Amino acid sequence: MIKKMKSYINMNSTVTTLGANYLVHTGYFNTISRLKVCTIASYRYYSTSKSDSQSSDLPPVPIFTINNLNNKDSIKSSRILLKDKGGIYSFINTVNNNQYIGSAKDFYLRLNEHLENKKSNIALQKAFTKYGLDKFIFCIYEYFTYESKIISHKALTDLETSYINRFNFDNLYNFKAIATSSLGYKHTEEARLKMVDYYKDKNNHPMFGKTHTEEALGLISKPGELNPMFGKKHSEATKASMSEKKNKYPLGVGIYDLEDNLILKFSNNVELAKYLGISKVTVGKYLNSGLVYNKTYRFKPIQD
């Protein structure tokens, strides 16, 4: 493994294997926009506004790694280490040393999202399929702990960008050199050309080998005024019926205590999210993972 990661790791440095409490209680902390950022391996300051001349020429050193990504039990055993800890992570391909760099507010949830292909990078997923999960290592370059989940998104993406810029962009699965939310984002010319090159291989296109149904083709071929639904609106009853059919949880979802007692019931995860004042994405994460929310509740589908 050391030979495979040689281009990323300073061999004179110590890659620390962290115990459950080590992540929280040790290390050198530097506050960046309310983030507690820890850089154990190289003890360096990292700022989003000022570069560190002493470390800018050195590749980042992982402070924690996980192998056996194809072993679900191995992933579950890392939960205590990764849960409620965020920062900068990477998936490194041990065959060619290409990697994907990302940021997360919860390493455990984000790792599982990638492994289950939920909101993951397309190029990274193709590499998982081509090489196998056993040829990848999950690495943490920098982390922070927090008591509240309300964390500056910009500070985190700025930190991610600083790490992306430390590597040759051609060796990254990332499509963007600047980490941002995709909302309202316009790709740089460099990123656009990288995506064009990626999709030259038809196998990389999400619709390659797939066909639309006759019904879908009929609707596509009738845009605008030719479409039978043009200018029409669904009735409230029809909308309710369509919503019910699309609902993943036909009996609704509920908030349960830690003893599995139902506290409140909702028609869907959107209603639950509105009640707690959180996003439906957050609710979905906890519904799918079965993890405890706010150390008090679990979100679960209502069963018969």
UniProtKB/Swiss-Prot annotation:
Q: Name one GO biological process term.
A: intron homing
Q: Where in the cell is it found?
A: Mitochondrion
Keywords of this entry = Endonuclease, Hydrolase, Intron homing, Mitochondrion, Nuclease
The EC designation for this entry is 3.1.-.-
InterPro entries according to UniProt:
GIY-YIG_endonuc, GIY-YIG_endonuc_sf, Intron_endoG1, Intron_nuc_1_rpt, NUMOD1, NUMOD3
One annotated Gene Ontology cellular component of this protein: mitochondrion
Signal peptide bounds: none
Molecular function GO labels: DNA binding; endonuclease activity
Please report the stretch or stretches of sequence annotated as the GIY-YIG domain.
84-175
At the top level, the lineage of the source is: Eukaryota
The record's similarity note reads: To endonucleases of group I introns of fungi and phage.
> Any extra remark in the record?
Encoded within intron 1 of ndh-1.
Q: What does this protein do?
A: Mitochondrial DNA endonuclease involved in intron homing.
Name by which UniProt lists this protein: Probable intron-encoded endonuclease 1
Source species of the chain: Neurospora crassa (strain ATCC 24698 / 74-OR23-1A / CBS 708.71 / DSM 1257 / FGSC 987)
